[in-house]
């Protein structure tokens, strides 16, 4: 393919796409430049479908290269390792809008790789990668019902900004990413500072106008350089087999579905499956997989039919009903804060831990953020769904869910000045039947309040679903697992009483329009307010006192010029304070100093030691010092951490002293008076001028 270059203006910057320049052996490849950010996106597909699977094997990789920001990787190996959390979240951003646009039943392996080659701080590389993935797939022979476009939206001074720069992102009240086709919205992800539903909806629709321009631009590229799509050969089920299975199993599946409790319902469905397979195994011994597929289709149809025609859900709820909620705080005696949040059969334990500011997470990546003082981690063990599988650390889903819950609480976390602690939340999913990420949001709020963290407002979350059959649209509140699995949308909305703090929308149909979004957001608001009311019945506000097991923080402000003295040569002075008191000390360049101690007493002791260092030594002042070492001509005495002076042998006593050891020894605490400080800062001390006469006489 000959090299071709395409350009368009997007939100005040030039978007440049080069085709045929690099990676020509991939099915599709696009070199995309926006500002000074450059991303190479490739798409490849296997020639044959993968046998024996019932899912679409799509993988998306987002490769961060530190050379893109002029960095050399740290560590001994000096090369990029496993993907960072940011890279995993970016890969999910690329994956989610394109996944529903592949043909249903397509089983060929498809791999999309976005490699970040150059990063302009004013241009987010993940947005460029999302556009590039659409280009690479659209021009290739891989079956894909795109193209899609993607933009970020900020809100600064009441104005929406498309693809905001670094400074605008810092000021923005929202960070919204929207992807869609020319006709509909496909994916939404946002973090916001209590934004009203109407504003969020307007932002999404505003983004769609720019998405249409991007899609039109990509369609023009496809017309010029696109190749014909390969034929999708889908497996067809024998019609006679399907009719017989439907006649035998439909009513049985319907009855099995009408079970409120998840485990019992799954057991009933398993029994129906075994009964049907047993019934047809002699007639269709080689078609058991086809029978399973027909049973799945029947289950999906019946579940959706119950909702669209009967307006009732499998567990007996109406479309707007929320499952029973119960909460408990302070469930763990030794942690700093803990809570259990239960909604139906979804249950999450969230634990809050408070640490020193030195415990912040340092991020070595290509993004804006360099350190995190607040973090949320989400664990989804196999027992939560009654399964057995190896424990291999967090997967992409767990990282994504943890980040969503983290984003939901971020706007209400107090600032470092208000609450000088590092905050870590861990959500353990104890039982899962849909919407565990939003249960983690609720559990996080309760755990923070139990820990005494002065959050600005409580946050709750709810997951909305969608069943769309023709013109019949059914929006579901508080979806459970089967409704997520067999439905058309998973729309998670978290926020306070005032507004939205985080949203995440994924769909399985080609897109949804403004009216569906509006309905979902309004129902989510009502659901969120109800859930908040149930949470506040358990704990109305953050506790006034921290847990007795939480560390105590003492704040000080010191002269920045004194920081060097506090640290001492090679860190000697500060290390000594830490060793003697058992505290942690964090010092900022502007002179802010934080002492984190397990108890207030040791913290106050460290504070006194630091004050002694920062206080100027004055001639005529008397200090209690410690003898550090002895020489033939006198004793060196430390009168403050890192500050020592000489008591000459002639100044040890009013009487003549033959040997220094006759009066003091190493380790003695003695009173001394400062008699002189020379131009070099050397301190002269006198013992004989510091002690009362009677004490001197008693000593001798």
Swiss-Prot record:
Tagged with keyword Transport: no
GO biological process: mRNA catabolic process; RNA processing
SMART domains documented for this protein: KH, S1
Ranges for domain KH: 551-610
Subcellular location: Cytoplasm
Family as reported in the entry's similarity comment: Belongs to the polyribonucleotide nucleotidyltransferase family.
Primary role: Involved in mRNA degradation. Catalyzes the phosphorolysis of single-stranded polyribonucleotides processively in the 3'- to 5'-direction.
Record protein name field: Polyribonucleotide nucleotidyltransferase
Organism of provenance: Thermoanaerobacter pseudethanolicus (strain ATCC 33223 / 39E) (Clostridium thermohydrosulfuricum)
Name of the gene encoding the protein in the UniProt record: pnp
